[in-house]
């Protein structure tokens, strides 16, 4: 457990992709810090499990691949009615899969890009509206070190994460007039269900993956940076990407 604690009592946050991995960790820590949390994901079963962990967690089932503007609006309207305007949001939803240049499944490639990039933009377009967000709200998106180093076989995943990282700078300028902030985080390999599922699907064992200087990351190694960016201590930080990789990028050229 971390010795550094944040107090988000009386604040409201939305976490998209909250049923597993980084999203679940972030939603849980926000609730532990006193915030009301709207946890959004596809799996109703996992969301029900989350809801039982804290009375501060409210849930909504939503598929970011098919969600319309009306769907996002309905979810946020309910949360705002219950607890007031939001103070920020985190978009962690993402999928990966092998998409090499020499041959890839077009449907998979489209789903990868739409989940990471299109979904995050759709969420922000709705969540950053005056009727849903307080002045000075903070938003965090997820990029990846794959967007920096270029990873063989991850053409669309790396491209989608690059798009997220670039979009953050533009969006920061568009929402800054209300004091809103937006930043992204680029983790390396983190021990999550999605990472392990991907490695298994391509026949890679855990030991065959290059880790950072500080070893393989855990969700709680990344969530601390998220909470910092959501907090008032980061009030002068926007439009940036934070590589949170345990030193992975330091060893890129070894």
What are these regions (language model features)?
Residues 2-3, 227, 238-254:
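Short C-terminal tail/terminal secondary-structure segment
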Residues 95, 102-122, 140, 164:
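Catalytic Tyr-X3-Lys loop
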